[in-house]
């Protein structure tokens, strides 16, 4: 144990709840479950957790510490490492600030900053005058986020703030495709996240009106899981692609990724290995009527946790270690992208961590892509094959979603 580690004791009246929420492998009495089969909080929050058989004596109850940010005349830097930081960035952008993020780690004044660190400079925000630091400190203080003052654009180690490894970005205009052909729960998750957590403006557009949409009115278009009929129209699809090539950014989630794969975008659904051995036993196809509800389970994955290997040098994975635990709700994985594609999140053989996976799917869920980015002209398409915002519960996926909206493509 290290100073500052949190101890959750099982010696308490809610010990059964502690066990249910923290045990790494959920125990299912019956695999015929109607909902997700794994929900361990350390995976959902992206935390390192350890179980101990012996009772651990800990100190006083943890008390939140209050951050006090000091004044600066040149600029601030803040770490990019969670949803609270993303909320601060969203609010600063709405106030008209131009921000920068670091593509590479750097060190300044004894502090180490990882990829994605947010840089706020006076030279980029002259129009705000003396209000710049008042606005910045007020928003950071309200969210208890530490700001690190800097006195120049030079750093002790790494790339200086004026280098090509530091990218500026402004507030993007974001649209969410909705309507009867879009999964209402999937769209609702995104809408709720923007409205209740980021407090960032979002324009809702009916996907059936795609032929009449002026895509150039927006910087980012979010496609939740759904059936996008306009992708079956070559003219409408080409208009959509043309907007992307001119600098538009798309964030596609779940089934929307499969829709784009079918519309000849740069991602392809991975098929089962042709070389897999098939059962040649004639009697293997025989089944009992009693098991009619259970047989389909061999090809199902009702919300299981898989470990995804991340390329955290790409902006989509900034703020993460070299891995991410995803909640897998379907059997879709994609081929590794080539040429203009970046394979940011991939799964390898033996990636299962917790939950139920049908016996016929275990060999399929390997050597494939789940999270990636396709460069298309001056724009990008971000593919998130799994639901990173699942029911506002999968906390560790929220930063990746913010990366896709604010950082990727800038």
Can you name each region flagged by the protein language model?
Residues 1-410:
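Intrinsic-disorder/low-complexity accessory segments
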